[in-house]
Amino acid sequence: MIVKVKHHCSDFNSYRAARVKSLFNAENGCDWERSAELPVEGLDWKIGLIVGLSGSGKTSIGSRIFGEPIYDLYAGWDATKPIVDCIAPDGDFNAVTGALSAVGLGDVPAWLRPFPVLSNGEKFRAGLARLVCERPKRAVVDEFTSVIDRQIAKVGAAAFAKTWRKGDGQVVLLSCHYDIIEWLQPDWVYDCLLYTSDAAD
């Protein structure tokens, strides 16, 4: 699958814009293009990873893979209820608590708090638990493991992958952290820095 991205904005000519162009030999900043060849066609996969530095095009590429909006881990939470009541409210209780534990949110008192009062890391993991329980057919998650410390990120990536592989659906994770690759064991990886892709053997 080839994903093409082209962003365009006005070519500004303010004093500062002109000075930046002159000082740094930058003709303009109004065009940004990227073409990425993702190894997804003909591959039976569940987890894909797009990795690269900030500004390398991960979000732009990810938002075009399925033609659907990026899954928002932080939207749609009821601030008047604990997160354990917000995740799959009509679903199985054990599936919800199992998902919370599986994504690394094992601090049970946090389950009894509403989403807005959680830490950034807890919010991220609660969002992953909701994703696991909702189990959409296809989803793209941006900033995967960006707001949690690196050791928890590695273990959490492995735990998420193990949980996700138990069910159906395809998920593409976007991350600036290369250290999660061996823990996540994705079916394919696209590196925005090297413009390369690899599928798992």
Model feature map: region roles:
Residues 140-149:
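Walker B catalytic motif
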Residues 47-49, 138, 170-172:
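Residue-level preference for the first positions of well-ordered beta-strands
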Residues 6, 34, 40-105, 176, ...:
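ABC ATPase nucleotide-binding domain signature region
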Residues 13-15, 23-29, 65-126, 130-136, ...:
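ABC-family P-loop ATPase nucleotide-binding domains
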Residues 183-191:
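Conserved catalytic segment of ABC-fold P-loop ATPases
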